[in-house]
Regions:
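Non-catalytic DNA-recognition/assembly elements of restriction-modification systems
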Residues: 1-87, 223-264
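Low-complexity, Lys/Gly-biased intrinsically disordered segments
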Residues: 60-110, 129, 202
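Short edge beta-strand segments in beta-sheet-rich domains
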Residues: 60-61, 95, 151, 163-166, ...
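A short glycine-rich beta-alpha junction/loop motif
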Residues: 86-88, 161-169, 201-225
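A short beta-sheet element
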Residues: 101, 131-132, 136-188
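Short, basic/aromatic beta-hairpin or loop at an interaction surface
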Residues: 106-120, 142, 162
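Short alpha-helix capping/helix-loop boundary micro-motifs
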Residues: 119-129
Length: 264
């Protein structure tokens, strides 16, 4: 049942990608070796510059596959802000609020199972009392993590006061152009993951992507009604995958109960 749920989820994401893009995954080509040694000048080694990646055509296929007008994230955002670097506590005391961190972004959603807390006053300033307080609809993206998890995102839709840690960046979009739930879905698709993989850098065992690189990520942006249809398609189908996972958990529990009966 878990495999069926995973296949269901993967199929859903590829189906949504087909709605907005003609991108098809192809097996990597093995480069032809013509020389054992090749001299490369230092000026050609700007590996992590977006311009270099574009020049080499690494992502042109992705951009050309879009079925709708292409926008950079920086063109869609109204504002963005790095999170707090304040030390958080495992125990919530009076005046403290939850701080969302890297482990709290799981499969495109907020997971509240490993929360830490810090004083609400740490998330405010005299001039901006709500500066680091999250609002419903905020888009959170993980800027530092493993290669597979860097760039993972989620939409904040919880009740109450929450803030977020420095390894996350919070975006607020111009909702007359794009809906945050739509952006979040696209950040789970290969057409965005390929862009993140191309620009992320590994240092000290962690991969990083900065705000400029996130801002340069391009996505296809259809009309708001079409975005709403895609969002509905995602959540309606996601319920089906969740049913598979629930059934798998039920089977696992029953198997353990039966095992204990046989042993004891």
């Amino acid at each position: 049942n878990i495999k069926m749920a995973n296949d269901y989820s993967d199929g859903l994401l590829l189906s949504i990608q087909a709605d907005v893009s003609n991108l098809k995954d192809e097996p990597p080509k093995t480069p032809e070796v013509t020389n054992l040694v090749q001299t490369i000048s230092f000026s050609d080694m700007n590996r992590w510059e977006v311009a270099y990646i574009l020049k080499e055509g690494k992502l042109e296929k992705v951009y050309k596959s879009f079925k709708y007008p292409s926008y950079e994230i920086s063109q869609l955002q109204k504002e963005s802000l790095f999170g707090l670097s304040s030390k958080a506590s495992l125990t919530q005391k009076d005046g403290m609020i939850p701080m969302l961190r890297m482990p709290n972004i799981v499969n495109g959603e907020i997971d509240c199972s490993q929360l830490k807390y810090l004083p609400k006053s740490s998330a405010t300033t005299a001039n901006e009392p709500d500066k680091w307080l999250l609002k419903k609809g905020d888009f959170l993206i993980n800027r530092t993590n493993s290669k597979e998890l860097v760039g993972k995102s989620a939409i904040f839709n919880l009740d109450g006061d929450y803030t977020y840690a420095s390894y996350l960046i919070r975006y607020r979009f111009d909702t007359s152009l794009v809906l945050p739930e739509y952006v979040n879905i696209l950040f789970m698709l290969p057409l965005v993951r390929k862009q993140i993989d191309a620009v992320s850098r590994q240092t000290a065992g962690q991969c990083n992507i900065n705000s400029d690189e996130i801002g340069a990520i391009r996505i296809p942006v259809p009309s708001i009604p079409i975005q709403q249809e895609i969002i509905k398609k995602y959540f309606d189908a996601k319920d089906g995958a969740n049913n598979y996972y629930a059934k798998a958990d039920e089977c696992k529990t029953n198997a353990l109960i039966n095992f204990e009966k046989e042993i004891f």
